[in-house]
Amino acid sequence: ISPLTGTNGEIR
């Protein structure tokens, strides 16, 4: 989990 991608691995 990343702050830029949220719970998924895609950047929105």
Swiss-Prot record:
GO BP terms, alphabetized: hydrogen peroxide catabolic process
Record GO cellular component, one term: extracellular region
Cofactor (UniProt): heme b; Ca(2+)
Main subcellular localisation: secreted
Enzyme class, first EC level, given as a word: oxidoreductase
Subcellular localization(s) per the UniProt record: Secreted
The enzyme's E.C. designation: 1.11.1.7
Details of cofactor binding: Binds 1 heme b (iron(II)-protoporphyrin IX) group per subunit. Binds 2 calcium ions per subunit.
Reaction catalyzed: 2 a phenolic donor + H2O2 = 2 a phenolic radical donor + 2 H2O
Source organism, top-level taxon: Eukaryota
One of the record's GO molecular function terms: metal ion binding
Keywords assigned: Calcium, Heme, Hydrogen peroxide, Iron, Metal-binding, Oxidoreductase, Peroxidase, Secreted
The family this protein is said to belong to: Belongs to the peroxidase family. Classical plant (class III) peroxidase subfamily.
Function of the molecule: Removal of H(2)O(2), oxidation of toxic reductants, biosynthesis and degradation of lignin, suberization, auxin catabolism, response to environmental stresses such as wounding, pathogen attack and oxidative stress. These functions might be dependent on each isozyme/isoform in each plant tissue.
Protein name as it appears in the record: Peroxidase 2
